[in-house]
Amino acid sequence: MKVMFWISFLAALTLEMVHGQDNSALLKVGTQAPAFTLTSIEGKTVSLSDFKGRYVLIDFWASWCHDCRKASPEMVALFAKYGKENIAFLGVSFDDKRENWENAVKHDQLTWTHVSELKKWKETTISGQYGIRWIPTVYLIDPDGRVAYADINGRGLEEKLQEIFGRR
């Protein structure tokens, strides 16, 4: 009986993990990106509207997320390559502890703007607004405030940036 319980439990957990990584909950390309205002590491308010007229790459992540931390060097490389273009990089952390968030930003050398609600992931407003079921998740918002790209793990992101900015 216990064996059947564990088999059922593991099957359900696997299905949830696979479903959790599905892009279907993300905002569709062309959709107006929801407005938000969050607090930066420096304690300043940052709104999506602050970046009007520029592309905005939004990286949803957390210090405790292994896949997010593993992707940090790739994001650093993209920032080095495209950071001087008409694009702002914005990290949105799902950390609920400021110290963990700040330490990860410093350790991973994430030198762009970072914001957080400092709440557990599922308790944040922005995770619902942007359909975040798995992290890392990356959005690219166009200069008109519409979704130009959305993907879990950022597959195809560099190709999209190359298409927009014409770099190889």
Residue ranges of model-derived segments:
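N-terminal "domain-start" segment that seeds a small globular fold
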Residues: Q21-L48, G166-R167
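Conserved redox-active cysteine motifs that mediate thiol-disulfide chemistry
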Residues: F60-A77
